[in-house]
C-alpha cells in the first residue's frame, strides 16, 4: 500500500525555501538574468556547503537539522512557443532532502520559475522515466515514499538525468544534470544528519 505525501511535502517545501544552498559558483549562466526582480521564485537563504562530490554538494540547516544533497544543471534546452517570452528563472536544481530522522530521502526538482500545474514534469535517467506529478509553485515531486525510493535508486545507477517541464507561461524546457558524485553526496548527507554511521 502506498503512503501518499500530504504534510511531508508541505514541510519539504517550507524547509527548502529557507534552507537549500544556492549553487552558482564556477558555472556559466544557463538562464535569463532575473536580477531586476522578474523572477517568480522566492529568495533563498544561502547555507554553507559542507562537502562536495563531483557535481553534487551537501549542506545542512542547523536550525532544524535538515540535510540535503543537491546539484545544478549542466545545461538547459528550451522549446518556446511563439511569443512565450524568455525563460527567466532563479538557479534550478535537483535535491534529495533528509528531515525528521527519515532515512528515505525526499527528491525534489526546483525549476527556479513557476511550473504549470496542468503539465507534470518528468525525470528521465538511463534506467527509466518517472513523472513528477505533484506541482507547487516552482517545485515538483513524486507522490509517495515508494516513488522517492525508485527515483533515488534510478539516480544511483545512472550517469545523467534530465528533467522536462513546462512553465506557467507555456515555455517547455529540459534541464540536464550530471550524477557524478551523487552516491557519495547522498551518503554524506545521511552521515551529516546522523542517519548513517560509517565507523560502526
Q: What do these predicted ranges mean?
A:
Residues 2-3, 27:
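General N-terminal leader/first-domain-start detector
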Residues 18-19, 24, 46-47:
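A residue-level detector for conformationally permissive "hinge/kink" positions
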Residues 11, 28-29, 39:
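Compositionally biased regions
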Residues 3-20:
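Bacterial N-terminal signal peptides that target proteins for export
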Residues 22-33:
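Hydrophobic h-region of N-terminal signal peptides that target proteins for export
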Residues 32-200:
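A generic "folded-domain core" signal
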Amino acid at each position: 500500500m502506498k503512503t501518499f505525501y500530504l504534510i511531508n511535502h508541505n514541510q519539504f517545501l517550507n524547509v527548502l525555501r529557507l534552507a537549500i544552498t544556492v549553487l552558482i559558483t564556477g558555472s556559466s549562466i544557463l538562464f535569463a538574468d532575473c536580477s531586476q526582480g522578474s523572477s517568480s521564485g522566492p529568495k533563498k537563504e544561502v547555507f554553507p556547503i559542507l562537502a562536495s562530490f563531483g557535481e553534487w554538494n551537501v549542506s545542512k540547516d542547523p536550525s532544524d537539522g535538515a540535510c540535503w544533497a543537491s546539484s545544478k544543471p549542466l545545461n538547459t534546452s528550451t522549446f518556446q512557443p511563439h511569443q512565450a517570452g524568455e525563460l527567466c528563472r532563479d538557479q534550478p536544481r535537483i535535491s534529495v532532502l533528509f528531515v525528521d530522522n527519515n532515512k528515505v530521502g525526499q527528491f525534489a526538482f526546483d525549476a527556479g520559475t513557476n511550473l504549470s500545474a496542468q503539465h507534470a514534469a518528468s525525470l528521465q535517467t538511463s534506467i527509466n522515466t518517472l513523472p513528477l506529478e505533484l506541482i507547487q509553485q516552482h517545485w515538483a515531486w513524486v507522490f509517495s515514499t515508494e516513488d522517492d525510493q525508485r527515483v533515488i535508486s534510478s539516480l544511483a545507477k545512472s550517469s545523467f538525468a534530465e528533467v522536462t517541464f513546462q512553465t506557467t507561461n507555456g515555455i517547455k524546457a529540459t534541464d540536464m544534470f550530471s550524477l557524478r558524485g551523487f552516491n557519495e553526496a547522498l551518503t554524506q548527507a545521511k552521515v551529516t544528519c546522523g542517519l548513517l554511521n560509517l565507523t560502526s
